[in-house]
Amino acid sequence: MVRYVKFSRTANRGVHISAEARINERIRVPEVRLVGPNGEQVGIVRIEDARKLAFDADLDLVEVAPNAKPPVCKIMDYGKFKYEAAQKARESRKNQQQTVVKEQKLRPKIDDHDYETKKNNVIRFLEKGSKVKVTIMFRGREQARPELGYRLLERLANDVADFGIVETRAKQDGRNMTMVLGPVRKGKK
């Protein structure tokens, strides 16, 4: 079995290859549609000829569309392509914004000043771009009056409507009632 040495000086941009792409002698079809190293269409050629062209160019023959009839192969430096794809993935992960969920706990019988303080905390979290999980904790006989919790959560949602939207409606879960608020996107307001 012949091993191909890879040396490349070409960039391969805009080609999506799955993680299990077959290369060089692992491609087991009689003929392929060949794309050259610069993106030019070579046409349908026998697999031996395609491997020879790739070997002569010191590049790899990579199967980019295995389900096509015949499969599409491209001549490229596979090692360099994998490295650039990993760099792009790392860069996109770095640029992703981490969503943080803050939690604010309330009681059904909350005083006005305490409510204002909790509401201001929720507004501050939403302005920073965090999601907020608002939890109302019921104790004892308070559990028999879930409508108090629903009213309190609706009041809070209306008070912070300029800063956040309700992502998950109020729902009761045992002794607690929860609602999730998300920040208002800057493009929508």
From Swiss-Prot:
Transmembrane segments: none annotated. The gene is infC. The lineage of its organism: Bacteria, Bacillati, Actinomycetota, Actinomycetes, Mycobacteriales. GO terms for biological process: ribosome disassembly. It comes from the Bacteria. InterPro entries: T_IF-3_C_sf (IPR036788), T_IF-3_N_sf (IPR036787), Translation_initiation_fac3_CS (IPR019813), Translation_initiation_fac_3 (IPR001288), Translation_initiation_fac_3_C (IPR019815), Translation_initiation_fac_3_N (IPR019814). Monomer. NCBIfam families: infC. IF-3 binds to the 30S ribosomal subunit and shifts the equilibrium between 70S ribosomes and their 50S and 30S subunits in favor of the free subunits, thus enhancing the availability of 30S subunits on which protein synthesis initiation begins. It comes from Corynebacterium glutamicum (strain R). GO terms for cellular component: cytosol; membrane. This is Translation initiation factor IF-3. Keywords: Cytoplasm, Initiation factor, Protein biosynthesis. Gene3D superfamilies: Translation initiation factor 3 (IF-3), C-terminal domain, Translation initiation factor 3 (IF-3), N-terminal domain. Belongs to the IF-3 family. It is found in: Cytoplasm. One of its GO terms (molecular function) is ribosome binding.
